[in-house]
Swiss-Prot record:
Keyword Cytoplasm: yes
Alphabetized SUPFAM superfamilies for the sequence: Xylose isomerase-like
Residues that coordinate or bind Mg(2+) 1: 230, 266, 294, 337
InterPro entries xref list: Xyl_isomerase-like_sf (IPR036237), Xylose_isom_bac (IPR013452), Xylose_isomerase (IPR001998)
Binding note for cofactor: Binds 2 magnesium ions per subunit.
Name of the featured protein: Xylose isomerase
């Protein structure tokens, strides 16, 4: 057990009037929301990288955090795990997520790095068994090391492709051994800086082949979790191939993988792509590929991925509304891909930030459930398209021809007039539930 969070009590639900930073006002794990316990609807997870591996640096300055587990040995990695599971206990979160590089030290060779990962997987397995905590998803860091500066799957060097594939295998093995519910692929540097030295077609084929290899290996080892792709439009490269949900679905369809792979959608990445979070979730729901979410927020003025903790209940409510419309999470969940500001140095800051974020999500979920159960918003949406239920409209949609439409307009003197969309009234309706 770690003493890093000494003096911080286990966080429990105390109700809306609670004033402590270490009490839940809205998140009550056992409260029933649309037929499920709130814990089972939200499926909260802590991100290992931001909470325990990030050192507080930025492009203009070095680390600001001084954590006792910062170091390059297995002892440091085990100390980090001890602190992590103590935090999971305090917050009573059921899940966590990691990249391989977050949980193990880098070795002098691939074999040594793999051995370090295997040692830490054994240690995390012991921690899981003792605590009851579970792995929501694992993934491979294929972007930090200099070998990946031109990408991993899309690298012009086949040796880098092979090294990345081998690394993914070790991470899938780790995720499988720990009972992970999903395996995530984020194309950290799968993109380009300039078209002057880029073969777009070749790199797309390479990315498709890598993903097919991942799917094949999933079935070979009997991994029953979901393979998830995470879209992001830019940063760190100028243009990322996995730009947004629509782009990734096109990619999956091209390689026949749309029934094998779903999406892990991040709020901050949606904003970078010029979309709202709910837009990306709704589109993934329509495509049948909504898998899991990374919950955070961006600074709307800065223009880059700030990974702040969520604090906007109306935004979060609209996101969970789309998730509930999809039937809720299956293997996915709500991972806090969120980090402290570099001036927030204290252990208590890390706990308080997650407590507040969990409350925001719980409040948003309850508002979303009220909207969906009430049914008025869906009824108004349905009414807007009522004309399409007419037999003539259905026939037009299911096999109509341009010449038939032309004849109909000419014969009837058709002159359709616009109907109000009522957006302001719909926004007022949504506000009633918040």
């Amino acid at each position: 057990m770690s003493d890093f969070f000494a003096g911080i009590p286990a966080v429990t639900y105390e109700g809306p009037e609670a004033r402590s930073d270490f009490a839940f006002r809205h998140y009550n794990p056992d409260e029933m929301v649309m037929g499920k316990r709130m814990e089972d609807q939200l499926r909260f997870a802590v991100a290992w990288w931001h909470s325990f591996a990030w050192e507080g640096g930025d492009p203009f300055g070095g680390p600001t955090f001084q954590r006792p587990w910062f170091g390059d040995t297995l002892d440091h990695a085990r100390a980090k795990a001890d602190a992590a599971f103590e935090m999971f206990r305090i917050l009573n979160v059921p899940f966590y997520c990691f990249h391989d590089a977050d949980i193990r030290p880098e070795g002098a060779s691939f074999a040594e790095t793999t051995a370090n990962l295997e040692a830490m997987v054994d240690y995390l397995g012991q921690k899981q068994e003792a605590s009851g905590k579970r792995l929501l998803w694992g993934t491979a860091n294929l972007f930090s090391h200099r070998r990946y500066m031109a990408g991993a799957a899309t690298n012009p060097d086949p040796d880098v492709f092979a090294y990345a594939a081998a690394t993914i295998k070790t991470c899938m093995d780790a995720t499988h051994k720990l009972g992970g519910a999903n395996y995530v692929l984020w194309g950290g540097r799968e993109g380009y800086e300039t078209l002057l030295n880029t073969d777009l077609g070749r790199e797309r084929e390479q990315a498709g082949r890598m993903l097919q290899m991942v799917v094949d290996y999933k079935h070979k080892i009997g991994f029953e979790g979901t393979i998830l792709l995470e879209p992001k439009p830019q940063e760190p490269t100028k243009h990322q191939y996995d730009y947004d949900v629509a782009t990734v679905f096109s990619f999956l369809s091209e390689f026949g993988l749309q029934d094998e792979v779903k999406m892990n959608i991040e709020q901050g990445h949606a904003i970078l792509a010029g979309h709202s979070f709910e837009h990306e979730l709704a589109l993934a729901r329509e495509f049948g590929i909504l898998g899991s979410i990374d919950m955070n927020r961006n600074d709307y003025q800065s223009g880059w991925d700030t990974d702040q903790f969520p604090n906007n209940i109306p935004e979060v409510a609209l996101a969970y509304y789309e998730i509930l419309r999809a039937g809720g999470f299956d293997t996915g969940g709500t991972n806090f891909d969120s980090k402290l500001r570099r001036q927030s140095l204290d252990p208590a800051d890390l706990i308080a930030a997650h407590v507040a974020a969990m409350d925001v999500c719980a409040a948003g979920l309850k508002a979303a459930a009220r909207m969906l159960e009430d049914g008025e918003l869906e009824q108004r949406r349905e009414d807007r398209y009522a004309g399409w239920r007419a037999p003539s409209a259905e026939a037009m949609l299911n096999g109509g021809k341009l010449e038939d439409c032309f004849a109909h307009v000419m014969e009837t003197g058709l002159d359709p007039q616009p109907v109000s969309g009522g957006q302001e009234r719909l926004e007022a309706l949504v506000a009633r539930y918040l």
